[in-house]
């Protein structure tokens, strides 16, 4: 019983640290969608700072800890968010993973380099070595208390428990009982919808990163007595705590916190009671990684992939279709010059460095296969390199020839890659990266500790081969041989990419569901990618070990593989020739820096790590960015011709019989007067065919308001709902106006010179088929999508440069396609985001009793009609100046649609300008004042509702016009 209590208590200490780190991971991921692999490095940097302030400069422990946790760590999080994380949130997941891994590499090295510089300058700092038994926040030495026979705790453990409990309560209060916490949880659900509600997602991101970094700093300070100043141990702590973040689904702080505590206890219990594994060398130290890998497999849900394309689609190949000389000429000339240089220009020293770079380039090209072709991030490449080299060394010690040992080592690495891939392939993205890293650590701790394989600390000798008269012990001969090998491998990978198998790999990368529909086996393709990549890494590993003439089990650890990944992806991972550049840079840069900048070993590591920062701007790497920039420069020199005008669709508008063009056609507007087509320039004479029937008062009838949606006049309504400014005062500017707007995505234009006007108290219905650009127009009007050309005006003010937050604060509200609600928030919390006052929310419940009865229910549990009711209800209480509704009837029953339209007409009568996008033209025409038809990104026509011919409009939708 005493042993059990000891295991539990000590496990709660490490569990508390796991909980703090996991909570920070969840907060930062929730705010930005970014998993921060450098979270443990932040903790280490804070621990190092605390140690130097306390032990070096002599500061008292508590003030030093407070400065680190509440000032320096949040400042670091804020700075990284502004410089890096915000931009990374908009790139593909591969670039996100690699960039944060680069930061993981760079931050500890940066801290150690600063300590070196301060020490050289004479500052009273202490060497930052892997010291243990360092003082913490409490008394030094730590005080101890005996709770029972053989069971004790010390002051450092007690402080860790108390502080962790206080942090848990503080986080619960922040997230559940403050408006900031509500906004943070809303950003977790839907970042863009948060901005559409006037809440700055960037500000929330900064706050979340500051809190997350503060928690990492707190974990670092508390862990100093336990872990010392070992960057490696802090990194391992981070990766184990990721299991707790998985328990919380990267969304729930309480679950992640509890998971961290339980993880620490479980780790100790397994290590303490797994007597069956006592004979396995390294098992106890490998327990955290077993738990991490098992947790990832069990807890990670398989994401739905149907209909989803990869977000990191390959860049445009500007040399597609070019001749061989244009595509490969520069690289072939470079290879030839390098071969000549080995025997004419370079010294033996530089010949050796170049040969080393070419050898490591073979390893780097394995990333081209698994990440460049497969979009999978493997962090186990160092394991494949070590495994192949150890096997080759073992065989050569038994008298095997080099070529045979190389072949067997390559096959062993390929087999090891297949074994790693089989359990991990059900994962993807960050979870696959974490799973492969866990297996890499397991190999380091268990597999490569086998005595017969590692041959002690000295390892195995791998002499360079001799092929007839060619002795590769000469660095020059080895360099030329490696140039030939690298060229052959690069040519083979390029041929693979262009082969049917390569196209299948690219299909699986871009759209797995579509690949399956085409008869491609996703599992078999991914397994092939992993196996081929591991085999290539093993082949390169044996050649690299041959260059060094020896291999040990610690030459290429899992952490080494992280540095490799950062270097090769920063250069460009999609093409094998970019991996060659990365290999040469990796070999030559440290020597160049040592000769011309500094001899510190930390600076090259910093630069290699910070190379990942460039991925925020060039996610495909700096080598891949060169042809893109050259192509843009060439395109800028070519004058652009006039863009072709698509033919106008058949509509309910009849062209002027004279056919005479208007010499100065006015823009197509939504102001109620006939306008010319801004696509063709021909003036249309709008003629009535089926006008709406007016009632005795001359007003257009609205659809019936159903009882469950509330009466338009019962309850307490928002200010101004009695107004009916259907005819605004002369000279009043439009509520919303788009003038000549051109916009699109990733350089592809969707809207071409769109002009739309909507006035207060008016409904503009925008119609058009799928792909016409209706939703894009909504995003532009709401500020979610910037314009390429043209302007957007709100109440007569130029708001073109305003984002969604400023547009929302100016009174422009977008109800996006689907449901504009936050699914995991309750009805009360959804309303509170828009209506701060309790009286306003009470008025909504009076108006919509069904919402009041279920105010504590998560919005995601409501029916489609109830969700749309929830989205519109606060707008009735506090009417916006402009409401943009994208497909408000989508997925709703006809009876519910009538209720939605009744609420929309009520908003119109309250003075709100409405821009409604619908595909169901028949329904929307019943409430519209003005109609615009969008086709191929252009406003084909626009005019009053009474002048729309519904039969011809139907023909236009169905493509039946003559």
Placement of each model-derived feature along the sequence:
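Transmembrane alpha-helices and adjacent helix-loop boundaries
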Residues: 40-43, 90-134, 149-156, 202, ...
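The feature captures the beta-strand-to-loop junction immediately N-terminal to the Walker
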Residues: 767-769
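Helix-to-loop junction immediately C-terminal to a conserved catalytic motif
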Residues: 782
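Conserved ABC transporter NBD signature motif
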Residues: 790-799, 810, 838-846, 941-943
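ABC ATPase NBD coupling module
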Residues: 798-819, 855-856, 948-954
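A short, proline-enriched helix->beta-strand linker immediately N-terminal to the Walker B motif
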Residues: 877-881
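Catalytic Walker B motif of ABC-type/P-loop ATPase nucleotide-binding domains
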Residues: 883-887
